[in-house]
């Protein structure tokens, strides 16, 4: 079976955001068909669309899998549900966890249920910065566009900064 590299965006702005992202990453890694999981640092970002909500904590996760794209979508939706995300969320509202598939190998998929590459990547600095951290030489599949190109041309001028966790000795 072919193993594909997959990139996910994780975001949370309700509850213990650090714990939500960590639990989502752990839940993904428990799936025996997901291996070699790597997570970026966490990044704090202000909400882009609905400004009347808490700041987000975001990360990007990379892994290898033999699962197919719609199977990965199913896994991500199960993780979201396990962590308490409601299926009835209104777009751009606060959420415990949000997991989006950014890239799936060189796949290009456009259906009502799934779009790969994610259509909003180039517009979201909170996705681009953590992606560049774990994959600085990344090129968008089927193009010569680099992660640096995407960051340079990103229209998102919102504040996105690396998050440093408070660790008690």
What residue spans do the PLM features occupy?
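Nucleotide and nucleotide-moiety/phosphate-recognizing core
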Residues: 2-10, 14-91, 95, 106
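Short, Lys/Arg-enriched, disordered terminal segments
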Residues: 1-4, 167-169
């Amino acid at each position: 079976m072919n193993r594909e590299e997959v990139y996910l965006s994780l975001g949370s702005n309700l509850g213990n955001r650090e714990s939500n992202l960590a639990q989502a990453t752990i839940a993904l890694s428990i799936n025996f068909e997901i291996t070699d999981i790597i997570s970026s640092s966490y990044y704090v970002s202000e909400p882009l669309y609905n400004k009347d909500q808490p700041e987000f904590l975001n990360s990007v996760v990379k892994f290898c899998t033999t699962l197919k794209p719609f199977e990965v979508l199913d896994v991500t939706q199960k993780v979201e549900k396990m962590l308490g995300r409601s299926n009835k969320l209104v777009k751009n509202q606060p959420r415990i966890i949000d997991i989006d598939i950014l890239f799936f190998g060189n796949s290009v998929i456009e259906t009502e249920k799934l779009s790969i590459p994610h259509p909003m990547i180039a517009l979201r600095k909170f996705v681009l910065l953590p992606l560049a951290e774990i994959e600085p030489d990344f090129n968008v599949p089927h193009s010569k566009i680099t992660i640096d190109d995407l960051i340079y041309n990103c229209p998102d001028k919102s504040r996105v900064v690396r998050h440093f966790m408070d660790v008690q000795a």
